[in-house]
């Protein structure tokens, strides 16, 4: 029984219906045409791969902010946080992580702390790699206070293909770094907003691993002056 439980743990529950549907269609196609059945099996295998839910080795420290998602650090810039969270016109450092369809899409809590507010904002479905996706696309914004008293924001953003954001958090939740909290289906983006004086440990173009890559360290002084693009 444990082996079956382990199997289900490595696949996110949001994928069960898709995998079952793909498998059923593959079976039906195979009964009519062997080649179509093979194509269906490949599609089913890809679906299983997409919804994989691997364990990660999470750095443990109240000072650290880790990547909430797998992907490429697409942009680091000064930007206003989502207005729906009520943080005003104070700019923060925005670290944008782009996920392609081959990345793990399970999202993780970036720091120890408490969830202060959540807000779902319906919107467009522009390509998640575009800067305007942070403003106009469908998104789920989360404001939290870290164990060190810092307020940070992380945002799940739907993309051109992604059409469903899943967030399992509730206001008042006490959370731990690296805990799974949601998923975005089929290509997306996650933005992390940090205070301006935060010492960043990542750079544009770097590959991030959700739950493992350290984005920032509140215990360090900011020693590097980053140049930001204003667009």
Curated annotation (Swiss-Prot):
PTM info: Is synthesized initially as an inactive proenzyme. Formation of the active enzyme involves a self-maturation process in which the active site pyruvoyl group is generated from an internal serine residue via an autocatalytic post-translational modification. Two non-identical subunits are generated from the proenzyme in this reaction, and the pyruvate is formed at the N-terminus of the alpha chain, which is derived from the carboxyl end of the proenzyme.
Annotated cofactor note: Binds 1 pyruvoyl group covalently per subunit.
Organism: Rickettsia peacockii (strain Rustic)
Entry EC no(s): 4.1.1.65
UniProt similarity note: Belongs to the phosphatidylserine decarboxylase family. PSD-A subfamily.
One GO biological process term: phosphatidylethanolamine biosynthetic process
Example of a GO cellular component annotation carried by this entry: plasma membrane
Lineage: Bacteria, Pseudomonadati, Pseudomonadota, Alphaproteobacteria, Rickettsiales
Keyword Transferase found: no
Cofactor(s) of this protein: pyruvate
Keywords on record: Cell membrane, Decarboxylase, Lipid biosynthesis, Lipid metabolism, Lyase, Membrane, Phospholipid biosynthesis, Phospholipid metabolism, Pyruvate, Zymogen
Catalytic activity: a 1,2-diacyl-sn-glycero-3-phospho-L-serine + H(+) = a 1,2-diacyl-sn-glycero-3-phosphoethanolamine + CO2
Main location (coarse class): membrane
Site (Cleavage (non-hydrolytic)): 187-188
Superkingdom of the organism of origin: Bacteria
Name the record gives this protein: Phosphatidylserine decarboxylase proenzyme
